């Protein structure tokens, strides 16, 4: 035990010891039933971790530590999600570069020392190398923070979603999806981000409100009558393929089945009926354009309409007019729009409509909900592209029902979050587009043969051999071809896309467990026990992982999901990097100590949003210091041998009452952890601990300083040792550093490898016959009386009297008179010695009364 107990530097000391001793090393020799496996969330490697990460990762770490102390071999890996758009954006901003796949690779390339004002174009391979270099630096910083926080991860079980093993597993899973018909290539309307120029999945959408304008424009019927349509996107007028009205709308029933002519472009379009048309929206009749929104896609598909694309992948109108625009005036009108952004094209169309007399009344402002890519800053467009899809139940009711059922098999913590999963699955409108038009990611493992004219045959893709995985089709030639045949007639071309980052992240149980790579390990850890994650990615990570496991193994990937809430800033808004209101955690860990920050984190229940609160961290630090001080006090009374924590030595009623209460705390804390309510475990343990320090230690102090051969003194020593031995283990999952420090002063090994306490340890069967006879002789009915509570109440009354009289707590009490029922007075007699010593009481008188026990204090 050090001369002066301190929290300073204990994180560095114990992190090093844990690593050297392999304290958290997974034992892969045990059977599956003895394993507790965690599908740890791999944090996105795109800058710094924030305090929200510390909050949620502490929760799962506390549970992993509890399970380890319960005797389970804990499989607790760590991954890095280091592929995808966030990483690309960080590299672009950090180095001041942009990827240009048309440029050749420069093996001697060195990025600018300072980011230039205009991004420097580099080859795809050079760009990927920069991504790898920067993510490796970020991963080192992430690992240092996690170690400082005290995550009990087995760092030998680390993976990155872009490493060779992860890429091979991701590509293998995709190819198996393809072989079973669960993955397919299709030309289809695609949600498209014009800034990043990539497809976006439904799960990555974000609704945002923005100001728009309704324009009322006139189509013309076959009889020459005007048909008024209101739209917020007049720039899509050249993409109009039909008008649509509700079949019961009497205003337009006479027009259904007829044809109207579009203004400016003179294109005949059919007038169709559909129940999704809204009579009370605008004029009640709407344009169907290819494509303005997802409703357009639905109408286009269900009404079997043609396609007239006008929007390019860059967010500008295509240079050539779509099919149907044929007469000279219409072509000329379109040419004034070609190459314009959607914003500029809208203004130009309005100008042309006004000049043609087809814009009716003044434009009307409106607030509309528009779909954005969650990481983008411009509204999404819908354009027709060729993409890879995985079937997810969006168009298959049988698969959708099976996935809903999977959600009901899963244990949700908290349970109410299950409805979010079900609502998402039930609301799917299409399959999962998994291809992305980006650069740093897992390549789609596909090539296409080229015919004699150099056209790709998409219907017969070339697939790699399994043993060749991972492959990069952009640099690897398929079996049977030479590199010289790339992009040549009769040769091959690579699929240029990479997979959505969720396509790889959805396989984290398989990647961490070594599916198809380490069959022995996989059999010991899969399906996993726990998936901890944030609730806002239920629709992405959780759902996609359930989907892939259902398709590959016909089972859930884990049995329980633990969902964390958000961290809220002082304005009660979610903390996030995109909002710029996050707090980086390292300064907090250094200022308050890791255990203090963990204390704040564990105070937030599963699924509950929690305020960022340094006040809670200060309380946590005081608690950690108090644990050291309490340990120091207990260890004053002898060596670890003399302080052997055995119930057989506990004979005094007050000591046994304290341990009985502690036994109840152990049971409550155990129940909390088994139900993933780590907050309950902390609360009940902390509440007991402060009572233990404030009341029991004061009550027992004088007796504990007595002669060691006195039975009552031995009882105090044994009770103190038992309580400390138990409390350090109860606090260990939440406060790993201070408990390990205190444990090391008097126990062998690590507290984190010690057995989790049980209530039975504290109430029997080791209670000696002598102790039992002592209790029976007292006739107190001790088992039904909270002697510690009774003694604490009397001591509190004594303290209060001294405080009100402005006297020292060591000032003597001339007389303590207790009035109450005979049973209460008899119970007090069992603890009278300790109360008198703690309160410095000279005389005690008792008087029976038919009232609760009431103390009267006469100060000396």
Swiss-Prot record:
Subcellular location: Cytoplasm
Keyword Magnesium appears in the UniProt entry: no
Motif window: 'HIGH' region: 43-53
PROSITE patterns: AA_TRNA_LIGASE_I
InterPro entries: aa-tRNA-synth_I_CS (IPR001412), aa-tRNA-synth_Ia (IPR002300), Anticodon_Ia_Val (IPR033705), M/V/L/I-tRNA-synth_anticd-bd (IPR013155), Rossmann-like_a/b/a_fold (IPR014729), tRNAsynth_Ia_anticodon-bd (IPR009080), Val/Leu/Ile-tRNA-synth_edit (IPR009008), Valine-tRNA_ligase_type_2 (IPR022874)
EC number(s) given by UniProt: 6.1.1.9
Keywords annotated in UniProt: Aminoacyl-tRNA synthetase, ATP-binding, Cytoplasm, Ligase, Nucleotide-binding, Protein biosynthesis
Residue numbers covered by motif 'KMSKS' region: 574-578
GO molecular function terms attached to this record: aminoacyl-tRNA deacylase activity; ATP binding; valine-tRNA ligase activity
Main location (coarse class): cytoplasm
Top-level class of the enzyme under EC nomenclature: ligase
GO biological process, one term: valyl-tRNA aminoacylation
GO cellular component: cytosol
Catalytic activity: tRNA(Val) + L-valine + ATP = L-valyl-tRNA(Val) + AMP + diphosphate
Highest taxon of the lineage: Bacteria
Annotated segments matching region Disordered: 469-491
Binding-site residues for ATP, renumbered to this chain: 577
NCBIfam families: alt_ValS, PRK13208.1
Record's function text: Catalyzes the attachment of valine to tRNA(Val). As ValRS can inadvertently accommodate and process structurally similar amino acids such as threonine, to avoid such errors, it has a 'posttransfer' editing activity that hydrolyzes mischarged Thr-tRNA(Val) in a tRNA-dependent manner.
Similarity comment: Belongs to the class-I aminoacyl-tRNA synthetase family. ValS type 2 subfamily.
Database matches in PANTHER family: VALINE--TRNA LIGASE, CHLOROPLASTIC_MITOCHONDRIAL 2, VALYL-TRNA SYNTHETASES
Comment on protein domains: ValRS has two distinct active sites: one for aminoacylation and one for editing. The misactivated threonine is translocated from the active site to the editing site.
Subunit structure: Monomer.
Protein name: Valine--tRNA ligase
């Amino acid at each position: 035990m050090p001369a002066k107990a301190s929290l300073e530097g204990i994180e560095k000391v114990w992190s090093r010891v844990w690593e050297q001793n392999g304290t958290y090393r997974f034992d892969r020799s045990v059977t599956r039933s003895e394993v507790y496996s965690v599908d740890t969330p791999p944090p996105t490697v795109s800058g710094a971790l924030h305090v929200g990460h510390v909050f949620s990762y502490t929760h799962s770490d506390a549970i992993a530590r509890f399970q380890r102390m319960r005797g389970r071999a804990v499989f607790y890996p760590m991954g890095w999600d280091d592929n995808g758009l966030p990483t690309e954006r960080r590299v672009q901003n950090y180095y001041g570069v942009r990827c240009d796949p048309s440029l050749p690779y420069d093996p001697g390339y060195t990025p600018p020392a300072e980011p230039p004002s205009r991004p420097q174009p580099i080859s795809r391979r050079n760009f990927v190398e920069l991504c790898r270099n920067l993510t490796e630096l970020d991963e080192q910083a992430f690992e240092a923070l996690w170690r400082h926080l005290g995550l009990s991860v087995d760092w030998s079980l680390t993976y990155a979603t872009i490493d060779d093993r992860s890429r091979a597993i991701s590509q293998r899973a995709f190819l198996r999806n393809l072989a079973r018909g669960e993955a397919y290539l299709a030309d289809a309307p695609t949600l498209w981000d014009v800034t990043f120029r990539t497809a976006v999945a439904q799960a990555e959408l974000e609704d945002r409100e923005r100001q728009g304008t309704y324009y009322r424009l006139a189509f013309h019927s076959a009889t020459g009558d005007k048909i008024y349509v209101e739209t917020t996107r007049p720039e899509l007028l050249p993409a109009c393929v039909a008008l649509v009205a509700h079949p019961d709308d009497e205003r337009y029933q006479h027009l259904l089945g007829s044809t109207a002519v579009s203004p400016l472009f003179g294109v005949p379009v059919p007038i169709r009926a559909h129940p999704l048309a809204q009579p009370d929206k605008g004029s009640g009749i709407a344009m169907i354009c290819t494509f303005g929104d997802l409703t357009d896609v639905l109408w286009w598909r269900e009404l079997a309409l043609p396609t007239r694309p006008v929007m390019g992948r860059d967010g500008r109108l295509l240079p050539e007019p779509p099919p149907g625009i044929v007469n000279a005036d219409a072509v000329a009108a379109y040419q004034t729009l070609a190459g314009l952004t959607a914003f500029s094209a809208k203004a130009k169309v309005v100008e042309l409509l006004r000049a043609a007399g087809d814009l009716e009344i003044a434009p009307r402002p409106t607030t509309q909900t528009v779909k954005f890519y969650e990481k983008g800053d411009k509204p999404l467009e819908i354009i027709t592209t060729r993409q890879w899809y995985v079937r997810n139940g969006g168009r298959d009711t049988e698969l959708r029902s099976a996935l809903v059922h999977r959600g009901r098999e899963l244990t949700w913590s908290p349970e109410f979050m299950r409805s979010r999963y079900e609502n998402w699955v039930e609301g799917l409108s299409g399959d999962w587009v998994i291809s992305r038009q980006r650069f740093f990611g897992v390549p789609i493992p596909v090539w296409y043969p080229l015919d004699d004219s150099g056209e790709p045959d998409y219907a017969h893709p070339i697939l790699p051999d399994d043993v060749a995985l991972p492959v990069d089709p952009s640099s690897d030639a398929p079996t049977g071809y030479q590199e010289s045949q790339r992009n040549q007639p009769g040769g091959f071309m690579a699929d240029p896309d990479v997979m959505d980052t969720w396509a790889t992240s959805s396989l984290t149980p398989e990647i961490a467990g070594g599916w198809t790579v380490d069959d022995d390990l996989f059999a010991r850890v899969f399906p996993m026990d726990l998936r901890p994650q944030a609730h806002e990615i239920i629709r992405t990570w959780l759902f996609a992982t359930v989907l892939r496991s259902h398709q590959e193994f016909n089972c859930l990937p884990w049995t329980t999901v633990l969902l964390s809430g958000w961290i809220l800033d002082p304005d009660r808004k979610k903390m996030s990097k995109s909002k710029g209101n996050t707090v980086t955690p390292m300064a907090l860990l250094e200022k308050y100590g890791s255990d203090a920050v963990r204390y704040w984190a564990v105070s937030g229940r599963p699924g509950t949003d929690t305020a960022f609160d340094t006040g809670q961290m200060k309380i946590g630090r005081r608690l950690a210091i108090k644990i050291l001080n309490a340990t120091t006090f207990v260890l004053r009374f002898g060596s670890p041998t003399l302080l052997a924590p055995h119930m057989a030595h506990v004979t005094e009623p007050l000591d046994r009452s304290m341990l009985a209460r502690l036994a109840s705390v152990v049971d409550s804390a155990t129940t909390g952890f088994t139900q993933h309510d780590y907050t309950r475990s902390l609360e009940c343990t902390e509440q007991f601990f402060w009572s233990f320090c404030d009341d029991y230690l004061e009550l027992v102090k004088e007796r504990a300083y007595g002669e060691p051969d006195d039975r009552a003194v031995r009882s105090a020593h044994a009770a103190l040792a038992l309580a400390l031995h138990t409390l350090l283990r109860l606090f260990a999952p939440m406060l790993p550093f201070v408990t390990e420090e205190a444990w090391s002063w008097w126990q062998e090994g690590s507290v984190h490898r010690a057995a989790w306490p049980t209530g039975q340890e504290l109430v029997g069967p080791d209670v000696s016959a002598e102790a039992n006879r002592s209790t029976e002789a007292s006739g107190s009915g001790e088992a039904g009386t909270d002697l510690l509570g009774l003694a604490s109440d009397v001591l509190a009354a004594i303290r209060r009297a001294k405080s009100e009289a402005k006297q020292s707590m060591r000032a003597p009490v001339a007389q303590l008179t207790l009035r109450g029922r005979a049973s209460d007075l008899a119970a007090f007699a069992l603890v009278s010695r300790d109360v008198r010593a703690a309160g410095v009481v000279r005389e005690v008188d008792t008087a029976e009364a038919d009232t609760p026990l009431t103390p009267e204090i006469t100060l000396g």
